[in-house]
């Protein structure tokens, strides 16, 4: 049961960290390529 409560306490933290990383990546992509319609990859 202790392992299950540890999982419940770490899953939201890992979710928050991963969502923050994805949001930061999207912000940086939009900073370097402001208009996605004209970005030539």
UniProtKB/Swiss-Prot annotation:
Keywords noted in UniProt: Chloroplast, Membrane, Photosynthesis, Photosystem I, Plastid, Thylakoid, Transmembrane, Transmembrane helix
Presence of keyword Manganese: no
Subcellular localization, as worded in the UniProt entry: Plastid, Chloroplast thylakoid membrane
GO biological process: photosynthesis
Stored SUPFAM superfamilies: Subunit IX of photosystem I reaction centre, PsaJ (SSF81544)
Pfam families, sorted: PSI_PsaJ
Range of residues in the leader sequence: none
Membrane topology field: Single-pass membrane protein
GO cellular component: chloroplast thylakoid membrane; photosystem I
UniProt cross-references to PANTHER family, sorted A to Z: PHOTOSYSTEM I REACTION CENTER SUBUNIT IX, PTHR36082
Function as written in the Swiss-Prot or TrEMBL entry: May help in the organization of the PsaE and PsaF subunits.
Family in the record: Belongs to the PsaJ family.
Protein name: Photosystem I reaction center subunit IX
Provenance organism: Chlorella vulgaris
């Amino acid at each position: 049961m202790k392992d299950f409560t540890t999982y419940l306490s770490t899953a939201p933290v890992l979710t928050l960290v991963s969502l923050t990383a994805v949001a930061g990546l999207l912000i940086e992509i939009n900073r370097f390529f402001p208009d996605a319609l004209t970005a030539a990859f």
